Every structure is written in C-alpha cells, then in structure tokens.
C-alpha cells in the first residue's frame, strides 16, 4: 500500500464562513464539470479508500489534503486520487496537483493559460497562484476524492449554474 503523502491545499487567508475565492460563473462551471465531487466515506476511512482506488489505476497516487484554499469544494482532510495526465490533455476546470518551486505539492484548479503554462487558483483564493503549472511541475489530475462531509457549496453552485444554463445537468454533485 502506498504511504500517505501530505498535500498542502495552499492555506488561504480567508475564512470558510465567507466564501472569498473564484466568483466567475464560467470558471466555477468548468471546475464543477471537470473536477470530481467528493464521495462520502466514514470518518477515518478517507485515505485508506483513496489508496485502494489509486492502487487500481496505473501511476495514480493518494494524497491527504490539508488547508483551506479548495474549501468549500474540498474540505481539509479530504483524501484525493491523483492520476498522471499528459500536459497537452489538461483543460480549464480540471483540478491538478503540481509541485511548487519550494517543493510543496498543491492542488488547485486550472483557470487560464499563458505562454509559460496554466494558471491555477484555489476556489477559496481571490487570485491565481504566482507560479504556473507546466510540463515539469505537473504531477497529475484529481480523478477521485473522499470526504466525511458533503459540499453544500458544490450542490448550491451546481443548481444555480444549471438554472442559468451555464452547465447542462445537475448530475454533477
């Protein structure tokens, strides 16, 4: 079984009770469309479940998420499965894991593209990260997540975006 790895979800300065972060409905729709919802599991089973799922996917790894930058989409203590992806297959809205220049692993969503790489941002952060994701620092894309609580934010945001015609189905929660 793969050893647990700590993944910093890049601590945000904002609090969870007041959602700061990404306001663009277009970006939120892409994130909801291309980032998997967390599956609910029993307390204490998050990482074990993610490790079992990762073991069934070639090259996949399980990580333990900490921090507030992806809240309320993914709460702290959400375990994630990260699957390798070709750099050219990355799309806006995917939530990827990359290695920052200081060596920390970060899970954030793709919100744009520049000549130097992809812009990424935590859904709870007001600005994109200072560093971009490129072929050298990309680890993979989140393909599954396991948590003990449901994301009310995801449910409410999905319903709002479906009502406005921004996404096609409410089957994304």
List each language-model region with its residue ranges:
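Extended hydrophobic leader/signal-anchor segments used for secretion and membrane insertion
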Residues: 9, 18-173
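Bacterial N-terminal signal peptides that target proteins for export
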Residues: 1-7
């Amino acid at each position: 079984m793969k050893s647990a790895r700590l993944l910093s979800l890049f601590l945000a300065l904002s609090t969870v009770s007041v959602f700061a972060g990404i306001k663009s409905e277009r970006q939120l729709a892409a994130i909801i469309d291309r980032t998997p919802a967390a599956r609910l599991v029993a307390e204490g089973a998050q990482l074990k479940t993610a490790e079992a799922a990762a073991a069934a996917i070639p090259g996949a790894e399980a990580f333990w998420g900490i921090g507030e930058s992806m809240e309320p989409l993914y709460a702290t203590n959400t375990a994630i499965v990260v699957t390798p992806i070709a750099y050219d297959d990355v799309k806006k809205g995917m939530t990827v894991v990359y290695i920052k220049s200081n060596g920390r692993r970060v899970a954030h969503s793709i919100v744009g593209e520049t000549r130097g790489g992809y812009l990424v941002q935590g859904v709870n952060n007001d600005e994109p990260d200072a560093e971009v994701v490129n072929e050298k620092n990309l680890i993979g894309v989140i393909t599954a997540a396991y948590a003990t609580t449901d994301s009310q934010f995801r449910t409410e945001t999905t319903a709002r975006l479906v009502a406005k015609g921004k996404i096609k189905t409410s089957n994304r929660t």
